């Protein structure tokens, strides 16, 4: 078997097994538009703008979706129940040895699930895909305590700028969430590269995005595989 054929079959099996996992839990597969009239509102992600024949629409300016989140949440609001989607997404300024302007994304929603139930769901998905590596779960704050001895949630803007400077890092930032993320990349991510699968949960409220805020933290998490962030919820 050629190397290309093997890769294609592996990809086919991966997608099929993901679908089987969600089908077995009565999660409905959906397809939503990838061509939208507005760009993403996420300040850290850039949409790709495209133009179409004006005869097809009132506007000639559209944007390729950076994720199916918005359209899927509209389905949820209409009472769809549990849903998932596997699709291509597009982001500008993402090309590199890790990121790409186009990639495949899995997006899913489980109605009534809290953050830790979603983590358990993903762990079950990984097991169904053949993963038997140990899994670590740790809060954002605890990770900073354990790996950098920093009280990240109770440190103010100036305090975190001083920490950046003490590590020889650029401190020219206007928002505390930017400093938090830079510190995470430089001080925490290198430490979790040795962990096969790591869930970081309870991010600072400044990084809530669309997540619910509970005190100083947002009820969201990310999953890292050997230091590479692959899941954001």
Task: Name the predicted role of every residue range.
Residues 1-4:
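Short, contiguous pre-domain boundary segments
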Residues 17, 33-63, 67-75, 84-111, ...:
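A translation/RNA-centric and nucleic-acid-associated enzymatic feature enriched
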């Amino acid at each position: 078997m050629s190397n290309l054929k093997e890769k294609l079959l592996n990809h086919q099996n991966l997608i099929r097994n993901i679908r089987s996992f969600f089908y077995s839990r009565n999660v409905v597969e959906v397809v939503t538009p990838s061509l939208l009239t507005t760009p993403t509102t996420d300040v850290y992600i850039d949409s790709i703008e495209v133009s179409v024949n004006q005869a097809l629409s009132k506007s000639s300016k559209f944007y390729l979706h950076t994720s199916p989140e918005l359209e899927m949440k509209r389905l949820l609001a209409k009472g769809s129940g549990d849903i998932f989607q596997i699709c291509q997404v597009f982001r500008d300024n993402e090309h590199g040895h890790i990121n790409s302007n186009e990639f495949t994304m899995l997006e899913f929603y489980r109605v009534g699930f809290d953050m830790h139930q979603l983590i358990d769901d993903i762990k079950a998905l990984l097991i169904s895909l053949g993963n038997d590596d140990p899994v670590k779960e740790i809060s954002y704050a605890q990770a900073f305590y354990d790996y950098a001895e920093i009280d990240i949630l109770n440190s103010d803007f100036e305090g975190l700028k001083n920490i950046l400077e003490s590590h020889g890092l650029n401190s020219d930032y206007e928002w505390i969430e930017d400093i938090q993320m830079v510190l995470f990349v430089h001080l925490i991510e290198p430490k979790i590269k040795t962990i096969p699968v790591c869930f970081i949960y309870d991010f600072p409220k400044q990084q809530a995005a669309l997540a619910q805020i509970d005190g100083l933290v947002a009820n969201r998490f990310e999953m890292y595989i050997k230091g590479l962030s692959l899941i954001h919820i």
